[in-house]
């Protein structure tokens, strides 16, 4: 089966003296850090372009979706950016005179990644590269969660939502959408684990699933606090650094525990920086697609893009 050839230097690029083929932008630096060929085996099964059609190279398509996540673009905006922006073409290995995949092709590729369960495997491969590069420090895990609005309007009296898997969550049930639960590496700020659920799932429900097993310290806010969790972590040889919350026996925390909470809050500030980058710089404020599987894909791709961005910052 024929595969579209990309990344070949055209006459226009040759006349530019190679500036179109290489550069020193932040995207060029990011692209140079990642061993992209290690993703090729995972993506190899996505080459089928259908009867009578040339297939787009899977690596190029994957890199395009990472660009989308880095800059918070819609599928249509990504198509336009690939056509117009030289740095995007270089990153995706598209020549100046080559056609770009349209938004429907990009959407179908993402759907195939979801259908074949490849996104978790791609995330795991990037995680391995981060470990080999020595930037994943494993000094501990910081647990937290953030709400992200659904693409569809919420259900109202007599009218169901177009997204039946989204739910209301947050204080007073004010957000209709999904929740991204993350474990962030305490030493580097890199995302180690991410799980997406409907917004009404409690933070503590998936907390144990966020842990990888090699953590020495687990930090979290009071939403994750329970006597059983603290005891279990200690039994596993992990230091539970979970903020304490008042209970019916102790409605007000003593000064000692207030100071303890303050120390943990300061150490946990890095996870808030992670969410700020995802939402403010990468525009992960709204799910663009319908359903839990696609919401999870958008968040997982954003986590991969964030980790690549963070990798470049840590080694810059």
Name the predicted role of every residue range.
Residues 216-217, 222-293, 300:
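Helix-centered, glycine/charged polyanion-binding patches within enzymatic domains
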Residues 46, 61, 79-80, 90, ...:
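A detector of single, family-specific signature residues
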